[in-house]
Curated annotation (Swiss-Prot):
Disulfide bonds join 37-85. ATP binds at residues 436-442. The chain crosses the membrane at residues 34-54, 68-88, 93-113, 148-168, 185-205, 219-239, 280-300, 321-341, 349-369, 380-400, 439-459, 466-486. It comes from the Bacteria. Provides the rickettsial cell with host ATP in exchange for rickettsial ADP. This is an obligate exchange system. This energy acquiring activity is an important component of rickettsial parasitism. It is a multi-pass membrane protein. It is found in: Cell membrane. This is ADP,ATP carrier protein 1. Coiled coil: none annotated. The gene is tlcA. Residues 1-33, 89-92, 169-184, 240-279, 342-348, 401-438, 487-498 are cytoplasmic. Residues 55-67, 114-147, 206-218, 301-320, 370-379, 460-465 are extracellular.
Length: 498
């Protein structure tokens, strides 16, 4: 017979493991399912897009796509989104954008992917143009495989539009503050399970023993899963609008108050803010350094993955495994990150990310630069060759850098805003989002693409020493910024405590 004490213990344990009340499951579970489907597509797209571009165009093309196609496309997509919001209800905007992605996936799956010779220009023409105009050869090669470039762009936009914008806007609109404290952490845990699930799906359908479709159409089942997943997102969203938003226990427009708009700053105002406030400048430097250092290692790593796994199928299966490890490591860091922040100083917690990046980056580049020496010493000790070891260390570096991003890096960055006065906190955060966000995400790609334009004879093999040098300079600047910010942070914290 259960005692009241044991009942209380079980009740508290349930709240820790599953902090959702029974009646809230009607709201929470469909939202979690929507997020799972969106992230299932996102992680599948991330694996496939690189497989197509890296093996058919070249790893060098990724930096050009990010800089000259994805970035302008994201701006155009946001302009279209704002226009749609002016003329349609929010619910219909969601249907239009999701249906657009669904339609593109269907077009790619059944027209562009199965018939590349019909939609792409003659390869000989592309090659002759590349030789005639070497400084623009990567632009020409991208045009030569334009359908894969469009797929890469749509894959990037899926994450921006469907997850960052539409899902979280819907979640923020219908979730009360007390619900958000319990719902959002659970969303993070459940969402990261989509990554290992993606790995299993990719591994099964692209395995050489799986013979569902013709060999040259191996990716079609994955596209069908993405189309089905997109359709389920639309159905779930519609069901929630009809059944959850009409339930007064779960949604009351009067209680879900309109949130104050974030301070938005122009590019010029953001630069002024960062150059006039040393404190805000340090925070921006953290974000820029993280984005550039990740991109510099990632580009070189993907070129090495292509050497080890030269076919689309093998490359995509490997990237699926990468998603598997990334998902579990992200969950682990989410669970232990808060404990680290409670037990160590801000400086120690903030220093973990750049030091981890420095150590793993140094190991990765060492295996590339000294591959013959390493091969000589490790022959007979390890079954893997230096290329496989370099790829493995590159994967570890990427997994850890993305794992710490959402737990330690973002947490320490956001903690740094707390001691600032309200005006500087709001404006400073807006300035950092504009400068740090833009230059962090595209900085590495701009460096790489500019290098390949100026030195057309270079690929990643020849350019790696230069990118490695830039990487180490950036990480050292990052460590300097953390130390500088810590001094300023401690002064402000001590002031507020007094």
């Amino acid at each position: 017979m259960n005692t009241p004490k044991s009942d209380n213990y079980l009740s508290e344990l349930r709240k820790v493991i599953w902090p959702i009340e029974k009646y809230e499951n009607k709201k929470f579970l469909p939202m979690a399912f929507m997020m799972f489907c969106i992230l299932l597509n996102y992680s599948t797209l991330r694996s496939i897009k690189d497989g197509f571009v890296v093996t058919d165009i070249g790893a060098e093309a990724i930096s050009f796509l990010k800089t000259y196609i994805v970035l302008p496309s994201a701006v155009i997509a946001m302009v279209i989104y704002v226009k749609l919001c002016d003329i349609l209800k929010q619910e219909n905007v969601f249907y239009v954008i999701t249906s657009f992605f669904l339609g593109y996936f269907a077009l790619f799956a059944f027209v562009l992917y199965p018939y590349p010779d019909l939609v792409h220009p003659d390869p000989e023409t592309i090659e002759s143009l590349s030789l005639a105009y070497p400084n623009f050869k990567w632009f020409i090669r991208i045009v030569g495989k334009w359908s894969f470039a469009s797929f890469y762009t749509m894959a990037e936009l899926w994450g921006t539009m469907m997850l960052s914008l539409l899902f979280w806007q819907f979640a923020n609109q219908i979730t009360k503050t007390d619900e958000a404290k319990r719902f959002y952490s659970m969303f993070g845990l459940l969402a990261n399970l989509a990554l290992p699930v993606t790995s299993v799906i990719i591994g099964y359908f692209l395995h050489e023993k799986t013979q569902i479709v013709a060999e040259h159409l191996k990716f079609v089942p994955l596209f069908v899963i993405m189309i089905t997943s997109s359709f389920l997102v639309i159905l779930t969203y519609r069901w929630m609008n009809r059944n959850v938003l009409t339930d007064p226990r779960l949604y009351d427009p009067a209680l879900v108050k309109e949130k104050k708009a974030k301070a938005k700053m122009s590019l010029i105002d953001s630069f002024k803010m960062i150059f006039t406030s040393k404190y805000v400048g340090y925070i921006a430097l953290l974000l820029i350094a993280y984005g550039i250092s990740v991109n510099l290692v990632e580009g070189v790593w993907k070129s090495k993955v292509k050497e080890l796994y030269p076919t689309k199928e093998a490359y995509t299966i490997y990237m699926g495994k990468f998603q598997f490890y990334q998902g579990w490591v992200a969950i682990a860091f989410m669970l232990i990150g808060s404990n680290i922040l409670r037990k160590v100083s801000w400086l120690a917690a903030a220093m973990i990310t750049p030091l981890m990046m420095l150590i793993t980056g140094a190991a990765f580049f060492a295996f590339i630069f000294f591959d013959s020496v390493i091969a000589m010493h490790l022959t007979g000790i390890l079954a893997s060759g230096p290329l496989a070891l370099a790829v493995m260390i590159g994967m570890i570096q990427n997994v850890l850098s993305k794992g710490v991003k959402y737990s330690l890096f973002d947490a320490t960055k956001n903690m740094a805003y707390i001691p600032l006065d309200k005006d500087l906190r709001v404006k400073g955060q807006a300035a950092v989002e504009v400068i740090g966000g833009r230059f962090g995400k595209s900085g590495g790609a701009i460096i790489q693409s500019t290098f390949f334009i100026l030195f057309p004879a270079f690929g990643f093999v020849e350019a790696t020493p230069y990118f490695a040098s830039i990487f180490f300079v950036i990480v050292i600047l990052w460590i300097y910024a953390v130390k500088g910010l810590n001094k300023e942070y401690q002064v402000l914290v001590n002031k507020t405590e007094k």
